[in-house]
Amino acid sequence: MPAIITDTLKRDLLAEIKSDFDSAGSEYYVGLGRSELWDDSDNVVTPVQSARTIDLFRRSLQGVKKIQDVSHIVPRYNWSSGTIYSAYDDNFTAYPSNAYYVKTDANQIYICLQQGKNATGAAVTSTIEPTGILTTPFTTADGYVWKFLYSITALKANRFLSANFQHVELLDSASNPLETLQINVQNAAVSGEIVGLAVTSGGTGYSST
């Protein structure tokens, strides 16, 4: 019978690990394994999950490093002028080819709620970088509708911002001004609010008058 591991289950499992990491008394380490020489013609052995394999791995560790901090991450998409961005759609099954959120040069994260469109209804490129910290959606001059989500602090950027991934977190309290901005956005969110619509069949025979 076909089955999938849902994203919700994955997030729940990660949340459990992070919660355990954040709790007092829990410590996590990254192990550094032994070095092995390989000839160019060798085939890499496929790892298997067995008690013996895990035991051998633990016994051959060269060293371990204690993990100081952890974070959820998502793919990084830098805002770039001339790019078409997708409006968020709850029917997405994965990250779309056109991103629906962006990171600006100021390390602020915005979600796209509506694409800019031309007179024929075709999507246009984004040419105005979103800015500002409003808790409500706003429209830029290119027709795109954005909403500010959060800012990545210097500490989080230093620890978790890479060329391909960025920090993301749902806060329950704030310890600095940037986190306060995110708390304001979270508190202002309205569950079930309609922030956009899509015309799936426009029909024919209409005039503009």
Language-model region placement:
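Feature for peripheral, non-core segments
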Residues: 1-109, 113-209
